[in-house]
Regions:
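Bacterial Sec-dependent N-terminal signal peptides
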Residues: 2-5, 11-43
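First exposed extracellular module after export/assembly in secreted or surface-exposed proteins
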Residues: 28-226
Length: 226
């Protein structure tokens, strides 16, 4: 019996250790010098900096006018900055669009500014009504890119997904001057489009969803007609 208990405790200890290494937020992690340099160069006025690791990334939580989090790869390449901003800090075009939308009467919660490598800046307004919570994604010019049910997932869901050159070439040729706003890979194994890459673009002022299959070939493009 003692041997069984010891084995169980050892297994639990190993599991806890692995989890701690994957998501270390105790503020005592060692940050490589090149990463420190990259952060200081990009955010020279950052204050109250605290480092942690999430999903294999180094994440700096800091204050630079507003509370923000910056995500970097281990070799110091910046991936994303998520800034918590007040409503009045939104571009006027975003506020005008929101205030004329069906969600204008909903209660506003968090508002985030997302800056990511490879895609344009996006503003996310989280609204709620009774038991419903929805995230509204806007471009800086006030275009509503998409609205999705808030799942309270980790912020890593906003990390950019790299498009293949073939995907980029297809978008450039099929939709000239399109602005790439969001890139997601469907990760629900129960959905028919598991593993597909969804690219949200704005083409000629119209938000469109471009879908590529698991082999990277174009599958479909859809948009709303009003």
């Amino acid at each position: 019996m003692k041997l069984k208990i010891y084995t169980l405790l050892l297994a639990l200890s190993v599991t806890w250790s692995l989890q701690s290494c994957d998501n270390d937020d105790d503020g005592s992690i060692a940050v490589p010098a090149e990463l420190q340099s990259a952060f200081s160069s990009k955010f020279p006025n950052a204050a109250n900096v605290k480092w942690e690791t999430k999903s294999g990334y180094y994440v700096a939580d800091f204050y630079d006018g507003y509370e923000a989090s910056a995500w970097f790869t281990q070799d110091g390449k910046w991936q994303m900055t998520e800034t918590d901003i007040p409503y009045n800090a939104l571009p006027q075009a975003v506020k005008t669009s929101f205030e004329s939308s069906e969600y204008a009467s909903w209660k506003r919660d968090d508002i985030d500014k997302l800056e990511r490598t490879g895609v344009e800046t996006v503003f996310v307004i989280e609204v709620e009504k009774q038991n419903q919570e929805v995230d509204l994604y806007y471009s800086a010019d006030g275009t509503l890119i998409k609205s999705i049910v808030d799942t309270d997932d980790d912020n890593s869901e906003h990390l950019p997904v790299q498009l293949t050159e073939a995907m980029k070439n297809f978008i450039n040729e099929k939709y000239p001057n399109a602005r790439i706003m969001e890139v997601d890979v469907e990760d629900d194994r129960n959905d028919w489009d598991f593993g597909y890459t969804e690219v949200d673009i704005i083409h000629n002022g119209i938000p469109k969803d471009v879908l590529f299959n698991q082999t990277g070939n174009w599958y479909s493009t859809s948009w709303e007609i009003r």
